[in-house]
A protein has these predicted regions:
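Secondary-shell segments that build the walls of catalytic and ion/ligand-binding clefts
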Residues: 106-165, 170
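Metal- and O2-centered redox machinery and metal/ROS homeostasis
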Residues: 3, 11, 38-39, 135, ...
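A glycine-rich, acidic short-motif signal
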Residues: 1-87
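Catalytic-core signal marking the mid-to-C-terminal active-site face
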Residues: 165-193
Length: 193
């Protein structure tokens, strides 16, 4: 139900940031958020700087490990520009989004070395070995691991939701999506400068 929550709460977040300079929105116990750029872009179109992140069930091994601990933990950032579209980016903190790995698997394409490991912890370019029991790796090695951990802390601990590994433990495997948290920050450049 993330879209319903976002549609109702983003206008309140924007209002609070414009009044106070900074505002945070915490979403808990929500299903997959999909791409986050639409919400950060919407906030930036209101003249605010926006940052959003979410954690999800584990699919990424920290640098040097072979077991998943982090979600793909996407982040999105948007910067407002007067009389122009905002600067926006949205990316996974994993080397590749799991959706891209699944597309490569379905279409029979290889993925770059460094994308993930087999279930035995071996490097692979075969997306099936990653998607079917293997793990993704963070982008940028230990630096990406640090950013993924930041997302776990912001979108899990800070908002009062689960870490990715806890989300997997609580998933009842009924075919429905597990739930997680999202952290959204809005900053008013006008109030702060």
């Amino acid at each position: 139900l993330a879209p319903v929550v976002l549609n109702k709460s983003i206008p309140e977040l924007v209002k609070a940031a414009k009044e106070n300079g900074v505002a945070v929105l915490a979403i808990i116990n929500s299903h997959h958020m999909a791409a986050m750029w639409p919400e950060t872009e919407k906030i930036a179109e209101e003249g605010l700087v926006a940052f959003a992140c979410t954690s999800y069930k584990p699919a990424v091994a920290p640098a040097g490990a072979i077991k998943p601990l982090f979600g793909t933990n996407p982040i999105s950032f948007a910067w407002p520009r007067k009389n122009n579209t905002p600067v926006v980016y949205d990316m996974a903190t994993a080397s590749m989004a799991m959706g891209e790995v699944q597309v490569a698997k379905r279409e029979g394409h290889k993925v770059p070395l460094g994308t993930g490991l087999t279930k035995d912890g071996k490097d692979t370019t075969d997306p099936a070995e990653i998607a079917d029991g293997g793990v993704l790796l963070p982008f940028g090695g230990y630096k990406g691991s640090g950013i993924a951990m930041m997302v776990e802390l912001l979108a899990g601990a800070l908002v009062g939701d689960n870490f990715s590994y806890e989300t997997a433990a609580k998933d009842n495997n009924d075919g429905g999506p597990p739930s997680g948290g999202e952290f959204i920050l809005a900053i008013s450049p006008d109030k702060l400068s």
